[in-house]
């Protein structure tokens, strides 16, 4: 099988994997409101945190990361060129953003992109995670933390392993573009800050 055929199959598989909306599925399984029509309207881990609590958000986060990590790792093991590897990673993110199984209404793709970058190396993953956490804690805006982490990702990659700078840059551009509405809301002061749903404790 040629490298082009393998790449096409991996791109298709990555898109289909990315199209599995874990936020919608987790909310359905746990009897939570549909994240596409509640909270911020974004079917991602941050919105699930708002409407469903920490445990549900963690489940969504881990699954979304795996959607990016598994196709990228398989492509890496198959020896695909770094640009082709980038296309596979972008396909997984596009599946998350425009899921064919959920009327093409998806999330921002941040967790999936992070998962796709993680196989490059644990150093990069730690840098990105630390960057997101620092700016999320400072600003209380998940979108700001995501945009800054995505913008710095190509620089981190160039420093750690320059072979993968181009595919990471492709993901970074996609993430920043996907946050255009958040950037507008930040500019107008309408962006929602991070918060966690507080459940009422039942008394017995």
Swiss-Prot record:
Catalytic reactions on record: an acyl phosphate + sn-glycerol 3-phosphate = a 1-acyl-sn-glycero-3-phosphate + phosphate
Membrane-spanning parts: 6-26, 51-71, 84-104, 118-138, 141-161
Domain of life, source organism: Bacteria
Pfam families: G3P_acyltransf (PF02660)
Alphabetical UniProt keywords: Cell inner membrane, Cell membrane, Lipid biosynthesis, Lipid metabolism, Membrane, Phospholipid biosynthesis, Phospholipid metabolism, Transferase, Transmembrane, Transmembrane helix
One GO CC annotation: plasma membrane
Pathway(s) this gene product operates in, as recorded in its UniProt entry: Lipid metabolism; phospholipid metabolism
Assembly description: Probably interacts with PlsX.
Protein name: Glycerol-3-phosphate acyltransferase
Organism in which the protein naturally occurs: Shewanella denitrificans (strain OS217 / ATCC BAA-1090 / DSM 15013)
Gene name of this polypeptide: plsY
């Amino acid at each position: 099988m040629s490298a082009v055929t393998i790449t096409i199959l991996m791109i298709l598989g990555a898109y289909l994997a990315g199209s599995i909306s874990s936020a919608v599925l987790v909310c359905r399984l746990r009897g939570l409101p549909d994240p596409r029509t509640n909270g911020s309207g974004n079917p991602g881990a941050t919105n699930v945190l708002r409407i469903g609590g920490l445990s549900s958000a963690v489940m969504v986060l881990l699954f979304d990361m795996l959607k990016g990590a598994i196709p990228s790792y398989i492509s890496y093991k198959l020896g695909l060129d770094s640009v082709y590897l980038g296309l596979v990673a972008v396909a997984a993110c596009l599946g998350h953003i425009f899921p064919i199984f959920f009327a093409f209404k998806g999330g921002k793709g941040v967790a999936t992109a992070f998962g796709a970058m993680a196989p490059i190396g644990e150093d990069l993953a730690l840098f990105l995670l630390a960057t997101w956490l620092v700016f999320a804690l400072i600003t209380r805006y998940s979108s700001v933390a995501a945009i800054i982490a995505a913008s710095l990702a190509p620089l981190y990659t160039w420093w750690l392993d320059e072979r993968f700078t181009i595919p990471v840059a492709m993901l970074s551009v996609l993430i920043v573009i996907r946050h255009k509405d958040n950037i507008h809301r930040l500019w107008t002061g309408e962006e929602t800050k991070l918060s966690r749903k507080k459940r009422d404790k039942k008394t017995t």
